[in-house]
Regions:
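PLP-dependent class I/II
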Residues: 1-260
């Protein structure tokens, strides 16, 4: 989310010492707040939320999400809600869409990629929901989006659309459910194994990702080197996800059970 705003010239000046951009309001997701960001003190124009979250693997309840919807409606901010991992939700109190919250249609845009649901990474197929009730001032964002999209994009290639169609077929749904259950098994194996080994871990229940605290005061890249050299395992250093990711590490369930 930061990178797209940097490329669009909206992020402001970068401070190497703090690793932050001047126009970006950072919302830490750490163990101290149970990986659920607190409402910002500054008033934002756009709020990016991703739940179940990448990289932490954590999810929030409908009640917690309703707080953000109410805040956005009160302040006039627009929420861009990334639901890419909703297919991995297992707990009943976790919303699969922001539109389950009252008032969301007047403040939220929802995105969802097929990449994680159906293994479509690289095929570039997703959907965007922009309610007609959503306005900035007197301007309807749906109308602006439709004009922009119709001018700059002719739609996904036909063969990829047919793949997307198959996702919603009876066989497609069954195959996807089987695949997701397979990855959940991997995530559970990683989560429980790390916990038994004494690591502090999060995620892995409503998500394919397990987020762990690096041991022995190692930073993220030191732990990356340690895992690579000692166990021949590659993971993702938490520092790559922003300032609050330092000291954490992401492992993925997207592999074979044997390798996991």
């Amino acid at each position: 989310y930061v990178d797209t705003n940097v490329m669009a010239g909206r992020a402001g000046d970068y401070n190497p010492a703090t690793e932050r951009f001047s126009n970006v309001i950072y919302m830490p997701c750490t163990a101290e707040n149970n990986f659920c960001p607190e409402l910002p003190k500054e008033t934002p124009d756009i709020i990016y939320l991703c739940f179940p979250n990448n990289p932490t693997g954590e999810a929030i309840t409908k009640e917690q999400l309703q707080v953000w919807v109410d805040y956005a409606n009160k302040t006039g901010a627009v929420i861009i809600y990334d639901a890419a991992y909703k297919a991995y939700i297992t707990e009943k109190d976790i919303p699969v869409s922001i539109y389950q919250c009252e008032g969301a249609k007047t403040c939220a845009i929802e995105l969802c990629s097929f990449s994680k649901t159906a293994g479509f990474t690289g095929l570039r197929l997703a959907y965007t929901v922009i309610p007609k009730e959503l306005k900035c001032g007197d301007v309807q964002l749906h109308a602006l989006w439709a004009r922009r999209h119709g001018t700059k994009y002719n739609g996904a290639p036909y063969i990829i659309q047919r793949a997307g169609e198959a996702v919603y077929s009876k066989d497609g749904k069954a195959q996807i459910a089987e695949q997701i259950a397979y990855y959940h098994k991997n995530a559970s194996y990683i989560f429980n194994g790390l916990k038994e080994a004494g690591y502090t871990v999060a995620g892995g229940v409503n998500s394919p990702y397990v987020w762990l605290k690096t041991p022995d005061q190692m930073n993220s890249w030191e732990f990356f080197d340690y895992l690579l050299e000692k166990a021949n395992v590659v993971g993702t250093p938490g520092s790559g996800f922003g300032p609050s990711g330092e000291g954490y590490f992401r492992l993925t369930a997207f592999g074979t059970y044997e390798n996991t």
